[in-house]
Amino acid sequence: MRSGYTTVNFLPSAAGELSKVIAAVKLFHTDMTRLLVFSISLGTNDSAEEGPRGAPLYPEEYRTNIKAITDKLLDEFPGCKVVYQQPIWYSITTYNRSRYLAAGLARLQTYFPELKNLVAEYSQSKPGQVLMGDTEAFDYFKENYLTDLIPESGNAGTFYLHPNKKGAETLGKFWAEGIWNALSVN
């Protein structure tokens, strides 16, 4: 997937990104005895003050969109697992084509309880299918942005949003551990 997507881009619709994902999965996931796991990390672009499609999304809107995406995946692929990965930290100077800044970072953090609440709700209606993955990368990148995120020039000075090679490897490890731990419990 490309950078810059929001939950709005993935809402269920014939022309939406989720339809493309579903079509691709149906092409390669032909052995129904194999576990199918979807890892979702959306929210960074939703939190922007201005810019990406649909932004800014407030917590209840974010929750509604994540739920719609999850419901569609569970409907299309009964028995699949959906693992939510908490979005990562970005600097309060983040302002490229889109304006994030301090308000965006504060909004991003209001999404975290929404993800956890959805996991709790699905544990009643779809036990063991919707799980919480990584919740630690946010704090890691907040502490290690100088070594793990790319310094970029923006409208409010230097900002840190996108992982560099080291950061991408670290983020991949956080997500892999999040998936492993979520699936190990269930």
Indicate where each model-derived feature is located:
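Structural recognition of the beta-strand scaffold that forms the well-ordered cores
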Residues: 1, 36-41, 46-48, 81-86, ...
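Conserved SGNH/GDSL esterase-like catalytic core that processes O-acyl groups on lipids
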Residues: 1-64
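Surface-exposed intrinsically disordered loops and tails
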Residues: 6-19, 102, 129-133, 138-157
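Generic structural signal for well-ordered alpha-helices
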Residues: 25, 66-71, 112, 116
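Active-site segments of SGNH/GDSL-like serine hydrolases
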Residues: 41-45, 71-110
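Extracytoplasmic/secreted cell-surface and envelope-processing proteins
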Residues: 46-56, 91-99, 141-143
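Substrate-gating cap/lid alpha-helix
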Residues: 90-136, 165-170
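Histidine-centered active-site loop/cap adjacent to the catalytic His
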Residues: 152-186
